[in-house]
Amino acid sequence: MQNELLDDPMDTGAPAAEAAAADEPLPPAHGIDREVTPKPAGNPDLMQQSLDNPAIPMHLIEKRDDRRESCDDGYSLTVNESAIDIESLACSYDSNAFFLRARFIARHCPILRADAYISLINYLKEHTTDITHYVAFFNELESELARKEFKNRQLNFQIPLRDQKWIEENGATWQSTTDQLQAEYKRHKDEGVKESTRRAMEDLFQHYMMAGKIDEAIRLYSRGIRDYCTQLKHSINMWINWMEVAICANDWGKLDTVTNTAYRSLKDADDAEKNSQQSQQAPPQRGENAPYMVERDPNAPIQTLTNRQLIETALAKCLAAQVLLKLRNKRYSQVVETILQIKTECLQSKWFVTSSDLGIYGMLSAMATMSRADLKLQVSGNGTFRKLLESEPQLIELLGSYTSSRFGRCFEIMRSVKPRLLLDPFISRNVDELFEKIRQKCVLQYLQPYSTIKMATMAEAVGMSSAELQLSLLELIEQKHVSLKIDQNEGIVRILDERDENAILKRVNVTCDRATQKAKSLLWKTTLAGANIHSISDKETRPKRKNQKESAKFDRNFGGIDVDEDPRGIAGPSGLSDDFNIAYDQQPQQQVQYLEDLGDI
Amino acid sequence: MTTFFNKLFTGASSSSSAAASSGMDLGSMESLCAAINELCSEKHVSENVGELAAGIVRKNKELFEKKSNDVEAFLLHCSPNVGSAAMVAAIKGMFDTSAAKNNETGTDRAVELLNHYVDENNFVGGHLKLVPEIIFPLLRDVGLYCLEKKNKPEIGQRIIMKALGSMFPRNGSNAPNVLTSAHGVLFACALETKDYASVEPFIDLHVDEIANENCIQDQEKSDNRERDFGDVFLGRMKKGAAFGSQPVAHNPHLHPKYVLDYLYNGACILIELKRFEDALFLLEICVGMPAFSVQDQHLDSFKKYVLISLILKGKVDVTENGDKSAIRHFKTKSPEYKQFSEIRFSRSSNTHSAVESLVKSAKDRLRKDGNTEIAKYLVVEMKKKTIMSLTRMFTSIRISEIEELAFLKSRDQVTELIGQLVEEQRITVRIDGDMVFWTELSPVPSKNDVENKIRIVDHLNTLLHEKNTTMKAGSGRMRPSVMYNEDEGLSMPPTESKFFS
């Protein structure tokens, strides 16, 4: 029912086939919804029966939960150390940010699993209507408590009781509320009032988010939410919601698209705001130069400040989201550059990443990629980074040890903070690589003044075992960062002199060989050209190219796509659908008028 | 020799005896023979007799096809010192006529005659070169006939080698390296006979010229076209002449597929000879040749290029192979080789195990492509590369660590690989207990060697500049549609010879 309402082509303008394809992932989720929240809301007995039969709903719940956790399921990580205080986590992060991190910890840290699940359960009950995750986490908690290894373990939180009444009440009301909100949304959409449609859409979005139905929320926003945002604050709120829901869903592709588009829009709004402030003597006017501005009283400084704050907050969140993306894509040098652009004072304190998180990400990325001189200038000597790391004294010491060549202390700190970083869902996958890069840089720095050095001495200085040191040296050699040879018999490392005459002769010889090869290849081509041989086969024998049809198809499709919209192009037809609806509504009147004119004749 | 050929080509018979017994008139061929032999007289300069004979042959080409029964008599009476071009034209006429009529006896006899005269060194190589449109197609067709029809590639190989050897001697002379359509067939025969060493001298990495096997026919066509225009449009002769001369300069000297044959088959032979660097060079040229549609050999070249590149470099530099869209097309056509092309050797990544897995999973495709042996060699070479990378990082190392760092399965495998590398003179090894002392044998070039190479680079650079200048000044800048004449002009309508008139 709900899908039919939302997927009506006349409403959104989306092709029916595309809508069907987009709905393919729905059946399992929809099936779960039906099992957990049956339609007859007024009949609690049916709900009780479905909950009393744990096989089917619990299996479906587990299945759905596993599907949503597909990104983490492929990541096998186990941290056997309680490196994070769950209670502090709840104080540092809010709403979905806490949910995301606590769930990650529950999956990958057996010691903190029970505490994490208890905290999650309490959060869900107090702040959401997400009975799906509530039941799933309760099952996980019970399984954890039933394990033999858990008997001697002490919990930091009180084990909650399953609140069956809460489950029943929310399950009963959720579907009716959903139907009501969907009907409201459709009604406003049919009426063609953008502001009302936007508000209804927003209510439905929040409803989905509260119930933990992230996929539904994303799908809703992908149906042209931008067309209904007529004010700057609404656009900003839309971008922030979209980014947050993409992060919650682990949809990095969507996040990339949204942040890029949002950044351009917000920069345009920012520029417009600056222009408006510069011409504050004259009243601002709506127009192409100020697409996001609303006419307002120039004597209202609070409104101006509010808009300004909104834009800067949104920009800060957008850049922070891009930091997560770059970290995910292992673009460490860009991570540092992006962090330096963020106005962290505008960043919400309990968002998905805090100032401290950004400081940690930036510092580690800088240590792994920057030279020592750049590191001192852009990180150690940068007030912004110092401010970001002011609550992380251990990491400040790490940076100082690194720049001061106190490698043993540096590695000691790295080992101590590693468990905590591994439990951060946004940097966990990068920790080993970053640490390895830092370690290699330390080894390179240590080797610089020597031509021969004992392995044992070096291992002691850098705080590694001989085996670990050898592995690091091998990696450095293979990456061509250093040229040396290891003599295991003597236990020494000899640095090779690249400026040696023999080495130079070899390099020149290789260069000449390469140049000769290239020249001979070109001579072949000139010989063929001289014989009027320009291609192997004749142009007339060329088979018909398939991409010609695809190119034509692309040309047709390209005309209907707004490049600033969602790449799937759904919003484009949605934007056109309004005009189409208006035209369609006006068409009968035209016909009637024409008939009337004919009647007069 | 005749007896030997009679045993090989069963059913062959002497057409000359039959002709003599039948009492056929040999007047036309006899006159031609007399005319050619007269070139030996004192009134002609010895240096020009070959060219004069070639001119006579071109003007009387149709006669050889019409009088194919008189070919043997003509060969008996014609003097090879001046009539080599005419003799090969006669044999070609006999061969083509018989082939057109599916007369196996005639084609066998033609091959026998050609082999006899070539084997006896009767032909003057310099004169044969004057008729490239005759000699090279003949050698090509005879080679293909022996290879495919008679399943006797060794005969075709010998004929082509002797003929090419007489035309382009390889005894240290400074003669230019010429690419002909016969070379590709020669290499194909060698691949069948597995006699690689004898054809190796004919594989040139640097080709100075491509034999013009089409130019003469085009010139004659142009002449005929001019006459036709002159007869019909008497008052517009100049325009007709200008129009008729245009196509001459832009016709390819050789059908491009023969270049492809040269490159691909030559590379295959070099691979068999373990000359992988040279093979890679030819394959790279082959893969980089532009084409409107991908040929089978084009794709096969890419496949071999991928494997050989991995053997030599441990990676595939696809960006240097010209058109990227072509490379993408190759990869689409051959997904298994796409996986190979994405490999980059890295000891720490245990590349040799990955390659071995790939080879096992793609063994059917490799067998169909005839690349199984190369793939096996690749697997072993990857393991050797792993050992070599360790020799560059250690001056001494424990045997147990070699096994661990090289990701090998046993100490015996380590020992075997090290032994092979020592035999190939790639490393030197001394074992003291559990410790291995080794070093890579990479010769250091002397200053003179480097200076010589620098001079070579300068020379090549100068040569490139000269060729570029020539191309800009000439017709190289014009790139008309490529047109080919598959029948090589032998099907032209007969015309009365000026010589006889």
Curated annotation (Swiss-Prot), chain A:
GO BP annotations listed: cell cycle switching; oogenesis; regulation of oogenesis
Species of provenance: Caenorhabditis elegans
Keyword Nucleus: yes
A Pfam family matched in the record: RPN7
Keywords noted in UniProt: Cytoplasm, Developmental protein, Differentiation, Nucleus, Oogenesis, Signalosome
Entry similarity comment: Belongs to the CSN1 family.
Biased composition (Low complexity): 14-24
Protein name, entry field: COP9 signalosome complex subunit 1
UniProtKB/Swiss-Prot annotation, chain B:
UniProt name for this protein: COP9 signalosome complex subunit 3
Function: Component of the COP9 signalosome complex (CSN), a complex involved in various cellular and developmental processes. The CSN complex is an essential regulator of the ubiquitin (Ubl) conjugation pathway by mediating the deneddylation of the cullin subunits of the SCF-type E3 ligase complexes, leading to decrease the Ubl ligase activity of SCF. The CSN complex plays an essential role in embryogenesis and oogenesis and is required to regulate microtubule stability in the early embryo. Mediates mei-3/katanin targeting for degradation at the meiosis to mitosis transition via deneddylation of cul-3.
Family note: Belongs to the CSN3 family.
Keywords recorded for this protein, A-Z: Cytoplasm, Developmental protein, Differentiation, Nucleus, Oogenesis, Signalosome
Protein's cellular compartments: Cytoplasm; Nucleus
Domain PCI, residue spans: 275-445
Pfam family membership, one: PCI
GO biological process, one term: oogenesis
Chief location of this protein within or outside the cell: cytoplasm
